[in-house]
């Protein structure tokens, strides 16, 4: 994953674990499981997701919604709750020794899949420590997370936000879905039974990044166990890389791809190396029945503040536990503005409102914005352009050009009544390199409520006609509202193109946010330069008169006599 990730990967894998909850004497009742973060090995302290505890709450999940409740004592759950924590080898427990003790795929679920122990499986299987019993110290939440969640998601009934660990069409009871929604933002602090002294290193396992120290666009590493306690030999501490896409106080979003079971897993920074930034609150987010490709996080620092406060109140005689919780990383600056976009080029993204329609845009000159035709479709229409950086401003503008609906290039140009002071003008790229890291900045998902989001990926394809680029494809997550936003090179910061659309399967209705299309800036730059210098729209008008091969590309059609069948 690159040299910069080495230290973070080691910390993540040392801190990752899986937590299982079951009922005493009821093995047939099944179990609940999630991922967790080892905060301290001696004594053993683990922070995990609170959703697995809702079946055990004496008063039901309604206890999690009481106003002013930031924590619940461990005895809020029934006496038949049994907890176990499992992790991989520690530094004092080499993989070789564990491999000798636990031959092959050691969990029953893996054996039931037909993965029999043997030399090949032993080489691939992950050595594990035996599950250890644990005690629930308290359930805790971050009030600020819940407040921001209610503001951003609570009243959005029309868009039907969906956070359960399944697709919207899957069979999930209303009661189960309500329990999962109530448990969002709730976590649990556990004390793990002590193991062999030789394996225990006293003190915190991780350091914690202060709230606001990681800015939008910063690289993140998520570590969790897909499907929880199922087959940890294979899935324990699976890594996923992404960036901090957006932030509202302690409520964070990342485009790192996480699966059900990774709830409670840790999310770590590349710089400072291995600092714990957040825990996974919901690995799958759906909006209007479409997967948005983002993971919901809760910042770790405020959670640990609640944990210290709660331990002092619930366990006055256990002050040593509070002391052993990880401290914030003092080398990280505090109090960075939460709306800081990080990379300076990202500030060129703006929100464009045209009547009841809104989308994204990019500043290409102090008084010139480019967006999509379907965002601002009528020439001479007045639009309102919002910029979030360096400060929130709104400036009126007029659509001076919009391509015709028959044009394959979905483009509109807005002339502003005033200059957008302080907004950097991006450098247009002259060349494109397939495979290079790229970023999309746009107002999809939240619109103006939370500022622009940043998603990362690679330039997966450059489609050319007669040797000239006419379409760019990326693996960045692109959502409704991102249309018209900029596509940047993550390395150079150069403007590569204008986001036009993601992909939708008309047969199934499924949307694929990680397959999307952008208009290369090289198609637009000569005409934009001509208009900016002379006011002449002639170059832009040429976008309405493209060749048939370009139209074929943007219709996503091939000039074949027979459409090839999929072999899948």
Curated annotation (Swiss-Prot):
Q: Could you tell me what induces this protein?
A: By the proliferator-activated receptor alpha agonist bezafibrate.
Just give the chief location class. Answer: other
Q: Which PANTHER family match?
A: PEROXISOMAL LEADER PEPTIDE-PROCESSING PROTEASE (PTHR21004:SF0), SERINE PROTEASE-RELATED (PTHR21004)
Which residues does the annotated region (Serine protease) include? 332-568
Which InterPro entries is this protein grouped with? Pept_S1A_Tysnd1 (IPR017345), Peptidase_S1_PA (IPR009003), Peptidase_S1_PA_chymotrypsin (IPR043504), TYSND1/DEG15 (IPR039245)
Q: What class of enzyme is it?
A: hydrolase
Summarizing the function annotation, the protein's role is:
Peroxisomal protease that mediates both the removal of the leader peptide from proteins containing a PTS2 target sequence and processes several PTS1-containing proteins. Catalyzes the processing of PTS1-proteins involved in the peroxisomal beta-oxidation of fatty acids.
Query: Does the UniProt entry include the keyword Transmembrane?
Result: no
- Where does the source fall among the domains of life? Eukaryota
- This protein's UniProt keywords: Hydrolase, Peroxisome, Protease, Serine protease
Annotated site, Cleavage, chain positions: 110-111
* Regulation acting on activity, per entry: Inhibited by N-ethylmaleimide (NEM). Not affected by leupeptin or trans-epoxysuccinyl-l-leucylamido-(4-gianidino) butane (E64).
- Give the location in the cell: Peroxisome
EC number(s) for this protein? 3.4.21.-
Q: Which GO terms describe its cellular component?
A: peroxisomal matrix; peroxisome
A GO biological process held by the record:
proteolysis
Quaternary structure per UniProt?
A: Homodimer. Forms a heterodimer with the C-terminal cleavage product (49 kDa form). Forms a heterodimer with the N-terminal cleavage product (10 kDa form). Interacts with PEX5. Interacts with LONP2.
Coiled-coil residues are none
Molecular-function annotations in GO:
protease binding; serine-type endopeptidase activity
Active-site residues per Swiss-Prot or TrEMBL entry: 374, 410, 483
Family, per entry: Belongs to the peptidase S1B family.
Protein name from the UniProt record: Peroxisomal leader peptide-processing protease
Kindly indicate whether the keyword Protease belongs to this entry. yes
PTM comment: the record says: Self-cleavage gives rise to an N-terminal 10-kDa fragment and C-terminal 49-kDa fragment upon import into the peroxisomes. The full-lengh TYSND1 is the active the proteolytic processing of PTS1- and PTS2-proteins and in self-cleavage, and intermolecular self-cleavage of TYSND1 down-regulates its protease activity.
């Amino acid at each position: 994953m690159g040299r910069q990730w080495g230290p973070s990967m080691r910390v993540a894998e040392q801190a990752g674990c899986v937590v299982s909850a079951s009922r005493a004497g009821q093995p047939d009742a099944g179990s609940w499981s999630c991922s967790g973060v080892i905060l301290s090995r001696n004594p053993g302290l683990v922070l995990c997701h609170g959703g697995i505890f809702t079946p055990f709450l004496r008063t039901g999940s309604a206890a999690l919604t009481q106003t002013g409740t930031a924590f619940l004592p461990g005895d809020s759950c029934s006496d038949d709750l049994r907890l176990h924590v499992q992790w991989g080898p520690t530094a004092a427990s080499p993989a070789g020794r564990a491999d000798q003790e636990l031959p092959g795929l050691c969990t029953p679920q893996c054996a039931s899949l037909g993965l029999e122990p043997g030399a090949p499986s032993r080489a691939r299987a992950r050595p594990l420590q035996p599950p250890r019993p644990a005690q629930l110290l308290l359930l805790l939440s971050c009030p600020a997370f819940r407040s921001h969640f209610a503001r951003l998601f609570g009243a959005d009934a029309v868009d039907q936000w969906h956070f359960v660990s399944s697709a919207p069409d899957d069979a999930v009871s209303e009661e189960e879905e309500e329990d999962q929604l109530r448990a969002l933002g709730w976590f649990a602090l556990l004390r793990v039974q002590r193991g062999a002294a030789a394996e225990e290193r006293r003190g915190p396992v991780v350091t914690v990044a202060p709230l606001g120290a990681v800015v939008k666009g910063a690289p993140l590493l998520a570590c969790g166990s897909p499907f929880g306690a199922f087959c940890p030999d294979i899935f324990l501490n699976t890594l996923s890389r992404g960036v901090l896409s957006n932030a509202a106080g302690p409520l964070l979003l990342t485009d790192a791809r996480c699966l059900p079971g990774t709830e409670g897993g840790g999310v770590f920074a590349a710089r400072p190396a291995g600092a714990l930034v957040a825990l996974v609150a919901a690995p799958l987010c759906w909006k209007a029945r479409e997967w948005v490709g983002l993971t919901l996080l809760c910042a770790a620092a405020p959670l640990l503040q609640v944990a210290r406060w709660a331990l002092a109140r619930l366990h006055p005689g256990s002050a040593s536990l509070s002391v052993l919780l990880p401290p914030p990383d003092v080398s990280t600056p505090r109090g960075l503005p939460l709306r800081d976009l990080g990379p300076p080029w990202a500030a060129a993204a703006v929100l464009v409102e045209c009547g009841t329609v809104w989308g994204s845009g990019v500043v290409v000159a102090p008084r010139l914005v480019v967006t999509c035709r379907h965002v601002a479709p009528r020439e001479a229409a007045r639009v309102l352009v919002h910029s979030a950086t360096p400060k929130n401003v709104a400036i009126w503008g007029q659509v001076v050009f919009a391509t015709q609906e028959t044009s394959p290039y979905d483009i509109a140009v807005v002339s502003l009544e005033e200059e957008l002071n302080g907004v950097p003008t991006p450098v247009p790229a002259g060349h494109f390199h397939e495979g290079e890291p790229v970023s999309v900045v746009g107002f999809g998902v939240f619109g103006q409520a939370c500022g622009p989001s940043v998603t990362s990926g690679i330039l997966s394809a450059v489609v050319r006609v007669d040797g000239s680029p006419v379409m760019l494809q990326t693996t960045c997550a692109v959502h409704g509202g991102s249309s018209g936003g900029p596509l940047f090179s993550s390395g150079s910061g150069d403007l590569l193109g204008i986001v036009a659309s993601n992909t939708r399967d008309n047969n199934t209705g499924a949307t694929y946010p990680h397959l999307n299309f952008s208009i290369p800036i090289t198609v637009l730059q000569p005409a934009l330069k001509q208009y900016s210098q002379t006011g002449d729209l002639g170059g832009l008008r040429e976008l309405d008169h493209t060749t048939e091969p370009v139209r074929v590309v943007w219709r996503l059609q091939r000039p074949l006599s027979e459409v090839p069948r999929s072999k899948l």
